[in-house]
């Protein structure tokens, strides 16, 4: 089902998970302020490797291309369960600024892969948990799966241990759920948030000291009995 968000851009509602791919704030707005801007403010190098969990409608990937540091090359790796969704993206009603990368959208829709001199995108159709074990290293992780309530397997301590093996400089996510933050905290990540007008808080995680407001998770640990999600099948 097509849904119009508050910034005028479109998203879809998943029948499987009964959730929209983006918040009501806006597909572009949420993507930029919770993922793209924070990530690129701390990662600026000749070649940037991004893990986009999961591909969905591709806003994270496409807006990364449109907003990447000027002289950087991007390698983007992204799992996605819904093969038919990817095939349909060539006709999705994206914002006008996406017109300049329509050739990329078309290529991905057909071949699940794109490469030119500055951009490489690989979409893996299947289980994200298996896919991340095939990767070597990543600079940025967009942790943007459906919510822990309905897509718990992509928010477990076992899952985040595999993410941690990739040594990301920053993990970005819309989630502020205590079990998610506790999993990252338990793995040695510093937890931050971002504060923009009219944008709900998310979580930024890094083992480095970053110039973002602290999430003050240690204070919360004094008031709660912490736990993290666990997937015994991982």
What are these regions (language model features)?
Residues 31-35, 127, 159:
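Well-ordered alpha-helical segments embedded in enzymatic catalytic cores
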Residues 41, 46-136, 142, 196-200, ...:
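The AdoMet/dcAdoMet-binding core of the Class I SAM-like
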């Amino acid at each position: 089902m097509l849904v119009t968000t508050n910034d005028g851009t479109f998203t879809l509602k998943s029948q499987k998970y009964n959730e929209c791919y983006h918040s009501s704030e806006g597909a572009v707005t949420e993507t930029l302020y919770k993922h793209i801007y924070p990530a690129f403010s701390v990662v600026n190098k000749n070649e940037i490797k991004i893990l986009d969990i999961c591909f969905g409608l591709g806003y994270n990937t496409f807006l990364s291309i449109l907003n990447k540091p000027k002289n950087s090359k991007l390698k983007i790796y992204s799992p996605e369960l819904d093969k038919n969704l990817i095939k349909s993206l060539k006709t999705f009603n994206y914002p006008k600024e996406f017109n300049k990368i329509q050739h990329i959208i078309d290529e991905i829709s057909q071949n699940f892969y794109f490469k030119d001199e500055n951009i490489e995108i690989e979409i893996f159709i299947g289980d994200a948990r298996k896919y991340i074990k095939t990767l070597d290293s990543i600079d940025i992780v967009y942790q943007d799966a459906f919510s822990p309530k309905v897509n718990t397997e992509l928010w477990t301590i076992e899952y985040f241990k595999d993410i941690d093996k990739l040594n990301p400089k920053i993990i970005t996510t819309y989630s502020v759920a205590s079990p998610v933050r506790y999993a990252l905290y338990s793995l040695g990540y510093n937890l931050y948030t971002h504060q923009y007008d009219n944008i709900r808080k998310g979580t930024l995680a890094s083992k480095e000291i970053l110039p973002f407001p602290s999430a003050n998770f240690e204070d919360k640990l004094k008031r709660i009995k912490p736990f993290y999600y666990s997937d015994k099948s991982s």
